[in-house]
Regions:
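Gram-negative outer-membrane beta-barrel transporters
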Residues: 360, 419-427, 435-436, 538, ...
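Membrane-embedded beta-barrel scaffold of Gram-negative outer-membrane proteins
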Residues: 214, 309-313, 319-325, 331-332, ...
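C-terminal beta-signal and adjacent terminal beta-strands/loops
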Residues: 488, 652-654, 675-731
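Short acidic/polar hinge/loop motifs at secondary-structure boundaries
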Residues: 125, 132-133, 138-165
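Structural signature of Gram-negative outer-membrane beta-barrels, strongest in the C-terminal barrel
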Residues: 253, 353, 363-365, 371-373, ...
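N-terminal periplasmic "start-of-domain" segments of outer-membrane beta-barrel proteins
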Residues: 50-86, 111-116, 133
Length: 731
């Protein structure tokens, strides 16, 4: 809608507060930039000098992107409309070409995508609870003391996604090393009254969606139903899912609005287990025989996320937001000779208040945030699935072990950002206080108390996390930023029942007999960078260095066999360093009569290593390649046709902490051809992946010391594939 926007000094306006992949696509020109709106937070207003602008008003997505650019650190903004021009299977497709975000897909179309930012959850493979990143839907938490289950993260039905890397997620209650990812759902204001979408392709892949959204006076709604199925590239990777996402909003007055959210989703994925590098090169479609023999698979039989958010804007342009969340996420893991059913349910409550004042005659924004998430119920029951070995004489379904968990996370934070030089210099400072409560015990068999003195294990920690930041606007097209932040995170509640202490007799032999002491991970991070535009180039460049104490790591200490399940241990590492470079560049190479040629590139340098560890010295931490480079060269015609080629390069990474063996580097190539109707009704595409049929390790789960042996630690990525899709929007 066209209109006139007027801002004066007396009126306040809303402040939505390489390596190369071969030798073809290289970094060209300068560098690119971009990121929390009502999506992650509603910012207060600021006073501006008189400006009259004739043109279109900013829509919700544009306001969100503008607000993210006001963060004094590394951020990403992902517009779902751009993502939906190709295959949208999992979150891996959302985070393609995003600097600083490592997202890899293995194990078929498993929603348990491996996502890491600045080394967060560095050792977590595909299908694990996500760690080290705070996840939200529409500014309300999904993550909690049990970690982050992945099944609700359906990538269709989103308006956009916001990534605040590292300490830059401070103002939304995140104190995680990797920062926060906020998935923002469509509403009635930015969706079609009816939309249908269908995708199909290699390895039996199919996905369907039907959605609807409208504005009906003061009320608006959006609903989306999806289902998908895949046979999988690798043996033992068949999967299926189905889900619903929706919300209803009501504008009671210009100052008061409220929105209710509901998500429900089920998934069922076969799990292939890990293979060796030699097996990968010989036949990447093969699965671990131990997984095949027991037909290992993992079900999320029905996860629910229900939330409400109410926002009130006071006359003095301060804002209050109250949020409530209920999250239930059961798991049925049938991945070995035993079957473990997990029951988790959490509640979250959040309170955010921000206001604009003047300090020494300058605009000053103050924010307060309180967030608490607590387990209502949390347990794991392990039962006999396939009687064998020590359970050979027990019936299927017999209880072997039960573990129970309690936990809560409470974050209180206050921050201020002041504009010390008009439209030029902003200084910010904040402090968070966080309390972690954890309790874990093995309640059956009772003998666990005798076998492990740490049963039950209980932890209660208070920590403080300060942050200072600066933004300097050299000119309208060039910004410098920097910050010094502390992040603090506790281990997931269930992970306290891990380690080397196991039962030595009875049906539970080999299973953990109790808890182990795990300290919170603390990281101090210095970050600085720049973003802006020069000519036809948009850039975003960030450097960071984190000094990490008690880093939370995981390792396989016993592989699965035909008679026993695998055993994974969580532990605190000695001092480590995480440092890196995050670079994004979007270059307009050609433009004429509505046609354009763009080159988008992202490079992520990840240097993570021990600081003089007694056993591993200065070894690299396994799991994340040191170099990740992505690029896409795409030509867009004025009639809506687009064609492009893309590449992804990842360097080798160790598969063990001793650095005696590695998973090799790889280089993937792809291409895309599509048509996006100028009327915004039809979209069709053909998305080609891994054109050279590269055999590569998409994810690894490391061991302590491979002693140079080719251990089973690899999950392969998909081979060559073709995917086609069509979408129609009834406007």
């Amino acid at each position: 809608m066209n209109g006139e926007v007027i801002a004066t000094t007396t009126a306040r306006s809303r402040l939505p507060s390489a390596l190369g992949a071969g030798a073809t696509l290289l970094f060209i020109g300068q560098l690119h930039a971009a990121p929390v709106t009502e999506s992650a937070e509603q910012k207060p207003t600021s006073q501006l000098s008189t400006v009259v602008v004739q043109g279109a008003r900013l829509d919700e997505n544009q306001r969100a992107e503008t607000a993210l650019k006001e963060v004094a650190g590394g951020v990403n903004y992902v517009d779902s409309a751009a993502v939906e021009k190709g295959r949208v299977s999992t979150s891996t497709d959302i985070f393609a070409l995003q600097p600083g975000v490592i997202a890899t897909q293995g194990g078929g179309s498993n929603d348990g995508t491996r996502i890491s930012i600045r080394g967060s959850g560095i050792n977590k493979g595909v299908g694990y609870f996500r760690a080290g990143i705070f996840y939200l839907f529409d500014g309300l938490p999904v993550s909690g003391p049990g970690g982050t289950p992945y099944e609700l993260f359906e990538p269709l039905g989103l308006s956009h996604t916001e990534v605040l890397r590292g300490g830059n997620a401070f103002d939304i209650g995140s104190l995680y090393l990797g920062g926060a990812i906020n998935y923002v759902t469509k509403t009635g204001y930015n969706s079609a009254p009816l939309q249908v979408r269908y995708e199909a392709g290699s390895y039996g892949y199919q996905k369907r969606q039907i959605s609807s959204g409208q504005v009906l006076g003061p009320l608006d709604y959006y609903v989306s139903l999806t289902d998908s199925a895949s046979d999988g590239f690798q043996d033992q990777t068949q999967g299926k899912s189905a889900g619903f996402a929706g919300n209803v909003g009501y504008q009671f007055s210009p100052q008061l609005k409220s929105r209710l959210y509901y998500r429900y989703r089920t998934t069922d994925n076969e799990t292939p287990g890990y293979i060796t590098r030699a097996q990968l090169k010989d036949d990447p479609e093969q699965a671990n025989p131990a997984s095949v023999n027991v037909r290992a698979h993992r079900k999320q039989p029905g996860s629910t996320w229900v939330a409400s958010k109410t926002q009130y804007t006071f006359d003095d342009d301060s804002n209050l937001e109250v949020g409530l969340v209920y999250h239930d996420y059961p798991i049925d893991a049938r991945q070995g000779v035993n079957r473990t059913t997990w029951g988790f349910s959490d509640y979250s409550a959040s309170l955010k208040y921000d206001r604009l004042d003047t300090l020494f005659g300058k605009n000053s924004i103050t924010r307060f945030n309180a967030l608490r998430t607590e387990h209502l119920n949390a347990y794991a029951k392990t039962k006999v699935r396939i009687p064998s070995g020590i359970t050979a004489n027990l019936p299927s379904g017999a209880l072997v072990r039960k573990a129970e968990y309690e936990g809560s996370d409470t974050v209180l934070s206050a921050s201020n950002e002041t504009e010390w030089i008009d439209n030029t210099l902003w200084l910010s400072a904040g402090l968070s206080a966080v309390e972690f409560q954890r309790k874990a015990k093995v309640s059956y068999p009772v003998g666990g108390e005798a076998d492990n003195p740490n049963n039950p294990i209980e932890k209660n920690d208070w920590e403080f996390a300060p942050r200072v930041g600066v933004r300097y606007q050299i000119n309208p097209n060039w910004q410098l930023f920097g910050n010094l932040s502390r992040t603090v995170e506790a281990q997931q509640s269930w992970a306290y029942v891990s380690g080397a202490q196991v039962f030595t007799s009875g049906p539970a032999t080999g299973l953990n007999s109790g808890g182990q002491k795990l300290e919170p991970q603390i990281a101090d991070t210095l970050e600085f960078g720049t973003r802006g535009q020069f000519g036809n180039n948009n850039w975003d460049l960030t450097f960071y260095r984190s000094h990490v104490q008690d880093e939370l790591l995981s390792v396989i200490i016993r592989e699965a066999t035909s008679t026993a399940d695998a055993l994974t241990s969580e532990y605190n590492a000695s001092k480590t360093i995480h440092q890196g470079v995050e670079l994004g560049l979007d270059s307009l190479l050609y433009q004429n009569n509505g046609d354009s040629l763009h080159l988008r590139q992202s490079y992520t340098y990840s240097d993570f290593f021990y600081r003089d560890d007694e056993q591993f010295g200065s070894n690299r931490l396994p799991g994340i390649p040191k170099h990740n480079y992505q690029a896409e060269l795409r030509y867009d015609f004025s009639n809506g046709v687009y064609v492009g080629v893309n590449t992804y390069y990842a360097s080798k990474t160790p598969v063990d902490f001793a650095n005696t063996k590695d998973a090799g580097s790889y280089n993937l190539w792809g291409a895309i051809l599509g048509w996006d109707s100028p009327k915004k009704d039809w979209n069709v595409y053909l998305d080609l992946r891994n054109l050279t049929d590269e055999k590569y390790a998409a994810s690894i789960s490391p061991t302590f010391n491979a002693n140079g042996n080719d251990v089973r630690a690899i999950i392969p990525g998909d081979g060559i594939g073709a995917y086609a899709g069509v979408q129609y929007s009834f406007r």
